[in-house]
């Protein structure tokens, strides 16, 4: 029987839009049609079973000889990508799966184009579902509650399946369908984005780690400001809180890491962030509090936003039970129990320490009071938001609380209620939070760290960092704006990281040590007023990269696309040679010399480019390459070759070409010295007056502006009604002129070309 959008189980085959996706489907597998207007493009898969248990596994059928890409948790905290063609290649803890159902799976023998089938394992009651494969190529549902006493499940709505010819649309519609079904989270498009995303920032972590002091924060901000690149937000990371160990706890010692045995001992700051503070002695004097630090750094450094770090449980080891002044949170030591799927993937020193020492878990019924006390204090001293870390630890603590899903919902509801009350700009960054317990419980949180950390001293981690964020974003970007993490501007891979963030649509912030900056690089990202040219969407892989492996196959480049108001941008990266090793459970360089890779960029790599063209567009475009400085006219359905050596990148600005009635053609590139050149164009209008054309633009920033004009030198270029000198290259059609440094923040230049 056919249900949903052409989805059926026929003769033990799961058939989607005429394509066989799974075969050997067991008789206990259910396919339930979705209901409601938003759900017409999909159906739910579930199982019937008389089995009970807090951890159950069921087969859905065999997946064979079809290309897929999935994102799965390779650590308790984080996801990464995996590509393959058979079910046995699907790892445990897979939370998103997309399968290419091509001609070979067409049961009717007809010549059909590919369809894309998305599988989203979701929450049902107190259980969470994930996908995994087995050696028989079966795609399995793993169902888990996280509490041995929670063992009864319904089983009818465990996985949502959607299909269509446009992979990006299918993914978005699938998540929106689950949103309507669950009613427990909101899609990214319906969330308020905090303004800090639009400005350059600095984070204390890789500069000082937990040793950070108030003096260090001032020094870091002043060092960047002195170079002419002024941060507008700062994240004071781990190291500001009042923490301590139990007498019986075992200290965790590792380079550049926190002591995970520590617990929170006070809501307020430690002595390092008090005026004239002394170790081991904190005072409750408002005039000496964290507020004096915030006031100082905001007033002296033109800061707009200050965020501070805390764990979702207060600190890594939770809140210390019975400590004076915090008894009313009713913290009790609990011992984490990780799921088998996570345990099979990594050896985590953090989890090992917390498991050994336990975690002081605030009573879920008191956790809003805890968050509100913490956040209201922070807001009162001038803090604008928080980076809430260690979130996935909650899934290990569900026993005795009705299970992992119920505990996560209580904590996230309380957290978001406190954020709404205390930080009106929705000031929260979600971190170490790549599980669906949290994603499907987030109604308001709008920013999420999208991959494992930037590891400055691990050469194997950099290329996989870029690839992981891009592929994770296919899933995470439907829930929140992905955050690509901090990076160092002075580093062998600094340009590589910077270029990726320029196309990511994300916040841009560094963790440089004072005095260790590459200001020339930062000026390609940051305007003089501290704002950035942030693209409109989460940066995602182009559709032709979905099923190729840019990390391991020795032949594929990674292309990441995004949109500006009137242009597109594509970042191309050679990521080959290193990745996460599932055997050694660490990042590993598997090829010291992965070689040069060739590929191409096309106009339609920018998936929704037609939506931002300010006219009826024929499909021709101008492509400007940032590193090579070349301007190329690219006719519709043609491509531009690109060749990159290992760890190299290139950024292309892609601009729809406007053809006027006199045959002349025009396309604005933007600020040519910036990575995301086209992000500077805020408005664009074409007036076609037959014998002449007029182009009116509003631009942000300063520096060299480039536009394409095909057949003649422009008659004039004016900026704010003043004629300006310009240069015209008839061979390429490139017109360039310079914008000065505006006196006002976010100033818009009025540019007219005719």
Swiss-Prot record:
Keywords: Carbohydrate metabolism, Glycosyltransferase, Transferase. It catalyses: alpha-D-galactosyl-(1->3)-1D-myo-inositol + sucrose = raffinose + myo-inositol. Induction: Not induced by oxidative stress. It comes from the Eukaryota. Gene3D superfamilies: Aldolase class I. It holds the Pfam family Raffinose_syn. Belongs to the glycosyl hydrolases 36 family. Transglycosidase operating by a ping-pong reaction mechanism. Involved in the synthesis of raffinose, a major soluble carbohydrate in seeds, roots and tubers. This is Probable galactinol--sucrose galactosyltransferase 1. It comes from Arabidopsis thaliana (Mouse-ear cress).
């Amino acid at each position: 029987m056919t249900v949903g959008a052409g989805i059926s189980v026929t003769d033990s085959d799961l058939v989607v839009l005429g394509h066989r996706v799974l075969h050997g489907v067991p008789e206990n597998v259910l396919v339930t049609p979705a209901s409601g207007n938003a759900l017409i493009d999909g159906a739910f898969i579930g199982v019937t079973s008389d089995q009970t248990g807090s951890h159950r596994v069921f087969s859905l059928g065999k997946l064979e000889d079809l290309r897929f890409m999935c994102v799965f948790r390779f650590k308790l905290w984080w996801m990464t990508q995996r590509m393959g063609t058979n079910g046995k290649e699907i790892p445990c803890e897979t939370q998103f799966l997309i399968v290419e159902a091509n001609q070979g799976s067409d049961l009717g023998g007809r010549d059909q184009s590919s369809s894309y089938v998305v599988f989203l394992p979701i929450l049902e009651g107190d259980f969470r579902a994930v996908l995994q494969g087995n050696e028989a190529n079966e795609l399995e549902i793993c169902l888990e509650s996280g509490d041995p006493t929670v063992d009864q499940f319904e089983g009818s709505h465990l996985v949502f399946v959607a299909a269509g010819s446009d992979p990006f649309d299918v993914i978005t519609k699938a998540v929106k369908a689950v949103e309507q079904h669950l009613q427990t989270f909101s899609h990214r498009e319906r969330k308020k984005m905090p303004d800090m995303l639009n400005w350059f920032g600095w984070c204390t972590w890789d500069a000082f780690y937990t040793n950070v002091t108030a003096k260090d924060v001032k020094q870091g901000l002043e060092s960047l400001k002195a170079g002419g690149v002024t941060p507008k937000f700062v994240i004071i990371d781990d190291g500001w809180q009042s923490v301590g160990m139990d007498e019986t706890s075992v200290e965790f010692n590792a380079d550049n890491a926190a002591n995970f045995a520590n617990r929170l001992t006070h809501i307020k700051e430690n002595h390092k962030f008090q005026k004239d503070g002394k170790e081991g002695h904190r005072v409750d004097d408002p005039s000496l509090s964290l507020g004096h630090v915030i006031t100082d750094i905001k007033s002296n450094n033109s800061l707009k936003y200050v965020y501070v770090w805390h764990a979702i449980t207060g600190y890594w080891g939770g809140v210390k039970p019975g400590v004076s002044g915090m008894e009313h949170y009713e913290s009790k030591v609990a011992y984490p129990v990780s799921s088998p799927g996570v345990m099979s993937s990594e050896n985590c020193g953090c989890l090992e320490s917390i498991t050994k020492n336990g975690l002081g878990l605030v009573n879920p019924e008191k956790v809003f009071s805890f968050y509100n006390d913490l956040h209201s204090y922070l807001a009162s001293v001038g803090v604008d938001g928080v980076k809430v870390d260690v979130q996935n630890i909650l899934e290990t603590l569900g026993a005795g609380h009705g299970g992992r899903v119920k505990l996560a919902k209580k904590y996230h509801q309380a957290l978001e209620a406190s954020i709404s009350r205390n930080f009106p700009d929705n000031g929260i960054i979600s971190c170490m939070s790549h599980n669906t317990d949290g994603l499907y419980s987030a109604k308001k949180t709008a920013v999420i760290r999208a991959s494992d950390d930037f590891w400055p001293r691990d050469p194997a981690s950099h290329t996989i960092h870029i690839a992981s964020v891009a592929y994770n974003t296919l899933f995470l970007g439907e829930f929140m704006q992905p955050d690509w993490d901090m990076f160092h501007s002075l580093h062998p891979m600094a340009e590589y990281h910077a270029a990726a963030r320029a196309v990511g649509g994300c916040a841009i912030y560094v963790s440089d040590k004072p005095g260790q900056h590459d200001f020339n690089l930062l000026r390609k990202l940051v305007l003089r007023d501290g704002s950035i040219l942030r693209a409109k969407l989460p940066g995602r892989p182009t559709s032709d990269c979905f099923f190729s492996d840019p990390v391991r196959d020795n032949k594929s480049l990674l292309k990441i696309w995004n949109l500006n108001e009137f242009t597109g941008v594509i970042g191309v990266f050679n990521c080959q040679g290193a990745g996460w090793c599932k055997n050694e459970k660490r990042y590993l360089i598997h090829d010291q010399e992965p070689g040069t890779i060739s590929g191409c960029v096309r106009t339609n790599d920018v998936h929704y480019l037609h939506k931002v063209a300010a006219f009826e567009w024929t499909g021709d475009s101008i492509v400007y390459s940032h590193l090579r400085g070349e301007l190329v006219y690219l006719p519709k359905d043609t491509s531009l070759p690109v060749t990159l050596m290992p760890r190299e990148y290139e950024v292309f600005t892609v601009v729809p070409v406007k053809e006027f009635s006199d045959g002349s053609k025009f396309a604005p590139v933007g600020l040519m010295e910036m990575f995301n050149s086209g992000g500077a164009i805020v408005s664009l209008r074409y007036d076609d007056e037959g014998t002449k054309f007029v182009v009116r633009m509003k631009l942000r920033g300063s520096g060299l502006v480039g536009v394409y004009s095909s057949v003649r030198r422009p008659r004039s270029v004016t900026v704010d009604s003043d004629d300006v000198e310009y240069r015209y290259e008839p061979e390429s059609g490139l017109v360039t002129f310079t914008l000065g440094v505006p006196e006002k923040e976010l100033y818009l230049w009025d540019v007219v070309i005719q």
